[in-house]
Regions:
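Active-site beta-strand/loop architecture of penicillin-binding DD-peptidases
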Residues: 1-17, 34-123
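Amphipathic alpha-helical transducer elements in NTP-driven molecular machines
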Residues: 23-27, 71
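Short surface loop/edge beta-strand patches of beta-sandwich-type extracellular domains
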Residues: 16-24
Length: 124
């Protein structure tokens, strides 16, 4: 499809050309580091049975009137699986989580809950 047309208007669709942002070796290195973060790091319990998960936790302080306050954070977890041939990628971001300030304790568990359902739905 190259355009959308109706009786009054026509819109040409522009398809961006794919671009290589990082090389294959760099992508593999980053994936390996993300696999290690799940296997041996803060996000150990985001592992899914029978699948290799690549992921990374994140915790950032939110500035408040020019200063950072320890209890105001953004917690996150990004991951994809299976790492060798991803079928899904997901980012979970929580602003000012209440139970813990850390992405490994808040965003990662939520990611795991959703990922477990995706594994079932996608029959991985």
């Amino acid at each position: 499809m190259s355009a959308i047309k109706d009786d009054e208007r026509s819109h040409t669709l522009v398809r961006p050309r794919p671009q290589t942002v990082i090389g294959k070796d760099t992508a593999r290195d980053i994936t390996d580091m993300m696999i290690a973060a799940v296997k041996d790091g803060e996000a150990k319990w985001t592992r899914l049975p029978g699948l290799t998960v690549a992921g990374k936790t994140g915790t950032a302080q939110i500035p408040d009137q020019g200063k950072y306050q320890e209890n105001k954070t953004i917690a996150s977890f990004v991951g994809f699986a299976p790492a060798e041939d991803p079928r899904f990628t997901m980012l979970v971001v929580l602003w000012e989580p209440q139970t813990s300030q850390w992405g490994s304790e808040t965003a990662a568990p939520l990611w795991f809950d959703i990922a477990r359902d995706l594994v079932y739905l996608l029959r991985l």
